[in-house]
Amino acid sequence: MSMLFYTLITAFLIGIQAELHSESNVPAGHTIPQAHWTKLQHSLDTALRRARSAPAAAIAARVAGQTRNITVDPRLFKKRRLRSPRVLFSTQPPPEAADTQDLDFEVGGAAPFNRTHRSKRSSSHPIFHRGEFSVCDSVSVWVGDKTTATDIKGKEVMVLGEVNINNSVFKQYFFETKCRDPNPVDSGCRGIDSKHWNSYCTTTHTFVKALTMDGKQAAWRFIRIDTACVCVLSRKAVRRA
């Protein structure tokens, strides 16, 4: 919006300069009609009203829609170094967090390009038995509306929400895990001896390969996402008599 405003102001100043230039070339005894100035002012007011009335959501939608025109070669997803179990390109929403152990679902008649074997790794994961608890409570969700992220150099980059692959629009999803509550119990982490330890739960991060915008082209970058919830401990100071 600010860029459009400055553009309109620049056009207005150029118009004024043009009018002044034409006025200097007018023969003596003649004046510029007031109608010219009125018309110029009216044009500027109309343009400014249209700029202010344009919904921000509509402008954002047009910008987001441009990513659909970015075509990606599907052969890129066959490179093992670009795969990540936490990044998924799909034409439909992935299963809920409770069902993320199986990513072998069909998408538009074909499996996702970067589908992984998370189910094989998760099948051997121990199931919590009755009476067993985690020191921290976490929640895992598929995030499909990520627009910006921090890359491995600490710079904020634009994340591609959608790309065109084989004439189909695929959305980029990220499987993120974060803490549900920094203090699951009053003393901090669950099961920690609060008499001798201070504790709290915190979300940790890792870097995954994701498609981002580099100028007007798509580029792979390492971006930071939430991946775990861990307990942080610090020993309490010993009080000496």
UniProtKB/Swiss-Prot annotation:
Keywords: Cleavage on pair of basic residues, Disulfide bond, Endosome, Glycoprotein, Growth factor, Lipid-binding, Metalloenzyme inhibitor, Metalloprotease inhibitor, Protease inhibitor, Secreted, Signal. Residues 1-18 form the signal peptide. GO terms for molecular function: growth factor activity; lipid binding; metalloendopeptidase inhibitor activity; nerve growth factor receptor binding. GO terms for cellular component: axon; dendrite; endosome lumen; extracellular space; synaptic vesicle. One of its GO terms (biological process) is modulation of chemical synaptic transmission. It comes from the Eukaryota. Residues 19-121 form a propeptide. Glycans are attached at N69, N114, N166. A 1-acyl-sn-glycero-3-phospho-(1D-myo-inositol) binds at Y173, K209. It is found in: Secreted; Endosome lumen. A 1-acyl-sn-glycero-3-phospho-L-serine binds at K209. InterPro entries: Cystine-knot_cytokine, Nerve_growth_factor-like, Nerve_growth_factor-rel, Nerve_growth_factor_bsu, Nerve_growth_factor_bsu_mml, Nerve_growth_factor_CS. Disulfide bonds join C136-C201, C179-C229, C189-C231. Homodimer. The homodimer interacts with a single NTRK1 chain. The homodimer interacts with a single NGFR chain. The NGF dimer interacts with a single SORCS2 chain (via extracellular domain). The NGF precursor (proNGF) binds to a receptor complex formed by SORT1 and NGFR, which leads to NGF endocytosis. Both mature NGF and the immature NGF precursor (proNGF) interact with SORCS2 and with the heterodimer formed by SORCS2 and NGFR (via extracellular domains). The NGF precursor (proNGF) has much higher affinity for SORCS2 than mature NGF. Nerve growth factor is important for the development and maintenance of the sympathetic and sensory nervous systems. Extracellular ligand for the NTRK1 and NGFR receptors, activates cellular signaling cascades to regulate neuronal proliferation, differentiation and survival. The immature NGF precursor (proNGF) functions as a ligand for the heterodimeric receptor formed by SORCS2 and NGFR, and activates cellular signaling cascades that lead to inactivation of RAC1 and/or RAC2, reorganization of the actin cytoskeleton and neuronal growth cone collapse. Belongs to the NGF-beta family. This is Beta-nerve growth factor. The gene is NGF.
